[in-house]
């Protein structure tokens, strides 16, 4: 298959996965292919195999696709998990911090060639069009953000950082899966830091909600009917009075709140279902507590519940 090297394939190690990396949605980051008897890498869903950006043909295909849409007159690109396109080619095991699998972060996030690839993308495509670019860059620091979106970086216009939405429970054993209350002092400190330290160096993106987050009113405000509207106005004022480009997620303009589904079968989100199964089956979390976590933190709180088709 001429497109096989467009993806990342590895042989089994001792009859198992090439390393211990866990996927972002739960389970292993590797999927076994019976036909070829090899594993392919998918940091997210197994239906989303990672592209092999080390392959120059892959990069050129991406650039050609971007040019096609730019020529159609689009206004820009939001680049999903763009900070993860470069991998450590040794593919070492990751540290097992919680759960059953190792952390791929140190070997895939802000990888060794990511800035080289983005600078090439800028030369080949972005610099030739009047468009806006924003990159999703989980785990990005102030210093890294300046590399991605600095005035002289030659890469992107701005990035999404997630420090402010991850401030709720920095010591939570299982990451986002917690019922801990949000730490507003940490939120204030983080927002001030990003406002001050990017000033004159790079441009900020401003957001409280997106397709991966619960509803902002439920998380940062009070979704009790008596306080929902006031909370929504307070959050909108906070967001829009800062320097940067604000992003309003669908429903946020209405002050929409979490769904609070009480049964597992009501959830459709792959991340929620896989983590519920993984953590409860392993005895790491009680089912009742995990359901409370889903009600507060599941992505299904903000996703379209019905089919998006006409």
Language model regions located:
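Active-site and adjacent substrate-binding regions of carbohydrate-active enzymes
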Residues: 1-310
């Amino acid at each position: 298959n001429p497109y096989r090297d467009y993806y990342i394939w590895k042989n089994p190690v001792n009859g198992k996965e090439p390393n211990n990396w866990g996927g972002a949605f739960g389970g292993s980051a590797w999927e076994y292919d019976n036909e070829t008897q090899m594993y392919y890498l998918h940091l997210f869903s197994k239906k989303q195999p990672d592209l092999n950006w080390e392959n120059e043909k892959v990069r050129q295909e991406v650039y050609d696709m971007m040019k096609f849409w730019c020529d159609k007159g689009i206004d820009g690109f939001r680049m999903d998990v763009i900070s993860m396109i470069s991998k450590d080619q040794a593919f070492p095991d990751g540290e097992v911090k919680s759960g059953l699998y190792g952390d791929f972060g140190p070997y895939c996030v802000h990888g060794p060639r990511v800035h080289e690839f983005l600078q090439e993308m800028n030369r080949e495509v972005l610099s030739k069009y009047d468009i806006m670019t924003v990159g999703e860059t989980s785990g990005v620091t102030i210093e890294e953000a300046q590399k991605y979106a600095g005035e002289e970086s030659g890469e992107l216009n701005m990035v999404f950082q997630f420090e402010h939405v991850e401030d709720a429970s920095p010591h939570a054993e299982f990451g986002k899966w917690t019922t801990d209350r949000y730490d507003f002092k940490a939120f204030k400190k983080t927002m001030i830091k990003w406002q001050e330290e990017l000033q004159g160096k790079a441009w900020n993106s401003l957001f409280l909600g997106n397709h991966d987050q619960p509803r902002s009113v439920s998380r940062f405000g009070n979704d009790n009917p008596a306080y929902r509207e006031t909370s929504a106005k307070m959050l909108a004022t906070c967001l829009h009075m800062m320097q940067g480009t604000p992003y309003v997620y669908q429903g946020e303009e209405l002050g929409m709140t979490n769904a609070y589904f009480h049964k597992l079968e009501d959830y459709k989100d792959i991340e929620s279902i896989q983590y519920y199964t993984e953590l409860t089956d392993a005895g790491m979390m009680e089912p009742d507590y995990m359901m409370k976590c889903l009600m507060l933190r599941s992505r299904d709180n903000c996703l379209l519940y019905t089919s998006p088709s006409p």
